[in-house]
Amino acid sequence: MQNIKITIAYDGAAFHGWQFQPGELQTIQGTLQEALRKITQERIMIHGASRTDAGVHALGQVAHFKTRSNLTAQELQRAMNALMPPSVRVVEACDVGQDFHSRWLAQAKTYRYRIYRGRILPPFVYGRVLHYPWELNEDAMSAAARQFEGEHDFSSFAASTGSEEDDKDRDMMRVIYRSEIVRDPANCEIAYVVRGKSFLRYMVRKIVGTLLEVGKGKFDVSDIPRIFDARDRSLSGPTVQPQGLYLVGLEYPDPTNSWATFKAQRRAKG
């Protein structure tokens, strides 16, 4: 039995997110699994590191799957790319140890949200950026972005589960290692770049919506700690559209730090 790690890039515009859905809805996971079924004649479950939402793109999504196929990782990669639409590509594949788990062993994820600032949106970036040509105080947005670094309760920046009890029980604490606004004047763009251990659903898009409110002057930089403390999602900015969001990549520990080691550490913590 092989355990194969793959790195995937995709344009999320035509897909209903990462996670497989029954019926005819096209998803990234479903597309990958269908290609593998045709290649191996096996019913293979692909485990993704991040469950990106509908319309969200990826430059370096990571997943893994187990197969009895005798094909090498590179042969599987070529065969999958030949069967899938050009909007999804396996850009790297390798055979890893049986203990590797793409989701649970990830140490950090990096996301990038692109905002196009030009007056006219070029057709070739349509569906890949948020278009906002109006005035923004980008310096204030940069200062506000830095407020998200460190460990915080992100209750004000997450989607509701739909259940008040479940919302109360969720662990909303997250650690953010990097949070900044990056300017790209040559392409009339700014981007929000964030790197952290893990993220809540809609968290990045809620942060971007809040930073835009700062840029418009509706929020002040000093409002960010107040919004954190309130633990009330109605006080943060709107959830921006998905098309500007990219999963840039994931980071993993040394291969010797295995899935079995991770589970042992979890048990030790109780």
Tell what function each PLM region has.
Residues 1-270:
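Structured-RNA-binding interfaces characteristic of tRNA pseudouridine synthases
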